[in-house]
């Protein structure tokens, strides 16, 4: 059984929560809870409220996601 591909969508950080988690408002209006990917964490990239980010969302649970890129 093949693994479903993750959905990539852009959004804006609304709020920074404890434990490196963020509330993100996506382009389509949904709000998801997203955590920071390992590469962003490894390179100490700071993410603040108002930043535009790219989020990967699993098709199985669209309420949670992973932040994979912060736009400049």
UniProtKB/Swiss-Prot annotation:
It is found in: Cytoplasm. Residues 1-72 form the S1-like domain. GO terms for cellular component: cytosol. It comes from the Bacteria. It holds the Pfam family eIF-1a. GO terms for molecular function: ribosome binding; rRNA binding; translation initiation factor activity. Keywords: Cytoplasm, Initiation factor, Protein biosynthesis, RNA-binding, rRNA-binding. One of the essential components for the initiation of protein synthesis. Stabilizes the binding of IF-2 and IF-3 on the 30S subunit to which N-formylmethionyl-tRNA(fMet) subsequently binds. Helps modulate mRNA selection, yielding the 30S pre-initiation complex (PIC). Upon addition of the 50S ribosomal subunit IF-1, IF-2 and IF-3 are released leaving the mature 70S translation initiation complex. HAMAP family: IF_1. Component of the 30S ribosomal translation pre-initiation complex which assembles on the 30S ribosome in the order IF-2 and IF-3, IF-1 and N-formylmethionyl-tRNA(fMet); mRNA recruitment can occur at any time during PIC assembly. Belongs to the IF-1 family. This is Translation initiation factor IF-1. It comes from Chlorobium phaeobacteroides (strain DSM 266 / SMG 266 / 2430). The lineage of its organism: Bacteria, Pseudomonadati, Chlorobiota, Chlorobiia, Chlorobiales.
């Amino acid at each position: 059984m093949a693994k479903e591909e993750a959905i990539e969508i852009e959004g804006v950080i609304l709020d920074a929560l404890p434990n490196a988690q963020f509330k993100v408002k996506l382009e389509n209006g949904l709000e998801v809870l997203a955590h920071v990917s390992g590469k962003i964490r490894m390179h100490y990239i700071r993410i603040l409220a108002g930043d535009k980010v790219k989020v990967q969302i699993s098709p199985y649970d669209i309420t949670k996601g992973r932040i994979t890129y912060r736009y400049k």
